[in-house]
Amino acid sequence: MVWFKRAIPSIRTKDKRDTPEGLWSKCDSCGAALHKKQLEDHLYTCPHCGFHFRISPDLYFSFLFDDGKWEEFDAQLRAADPLKFVDTKPYPERVRSTMQKSGKSEACRNATGKLGGSDAVISGMDFGFIGGSMGSVVGEKIARAADKSVELNAPLIVISQSGGARMMEGAFSLMQMAKTSARLTRLGERGIPFISLMTDPTMGGISASFAMLGDLNISEPKALIGFAGPRVIRDTIKRDLPEGFQRAEFLQKHGFVDTIVHRKDLRAQLIKLLGHMK
């Protein structure tokens, strides 16, 4: 027997399955719940605390180049397997599965376009592809970006976002440190500006090679920058590390980073800096 009856139907909340996946994200710093549109409007930075989410090269290209117009080059390069490396799965299988899952072909993309009305070359790394690790393809792409910069007599901007060298390629990966560094000297010989933008994280062989070789080394706020990770260092020296150790602000204080730029100011700041470097 029903004793009570609702005069007005209750509000029905959406089932979890009715809410599109990926619509909300949680800020890793302050814990705020952020809507996808809100993140897009703020270039994937938290409007509450300023935390910078990791983003892909194509997103950087879309807001750095004039009118979001850019043209990719050397997209066809693919990784080989010179060592026949196997960990939990063969290296070629790992690359294929990452490509299928991410929709990306490698951990680096190169593009040309206009920046402030002038030609520019941007090479962007992607942590979402095997940790942004540098293997032979990534090294070759950065080297070719330097070549394109020389060809166009245009400034080069490299956006680093990587855990370091790709262990699956062994010495072939480590060779890319010398290769990229040597190729970048051609820009200096011709007076072509090279700006290194370090984002979170810029570690290992990346920080030990081209990421620190810019005419200007700039960074996004609170980016982790270093060679070995803080936990490895702490466990090795058996001592606590200084507060903020290996963060962009710490490196700027000690002279390794020239300036720190919020993502919303990045395009304007790059145009201004390149204007001074002509």
UniProtKB/Swiss-Prot annotation:
First and last residues of each zinc finger (C4-type): 27-49
GO MF annotations, alphabetized: acetyl-CoA carboxylase activity; ATP binding; carboxyl- or carbamoyltransferase activity; zinc ion binding
Presence of the UniProt keyword Cytoplasm in the record: yes
Name of the top EC class for this enzyme: transferase
Compartments where found: Cytoplasm
Keyword Secreted: no
UniProt xrefs under PANTHER family: ACETYL-COENZYME A CARBOXYLASE CARBOXYL TRANSFERASE SUBUNIT BETA, CHLOROPLASTIC (PTHR42995:SF5)
Protein's name in the database: Acetyl-coenzyme A carboxylase carboxyl transferase subunit beta
Gene that specifies this protein: accD
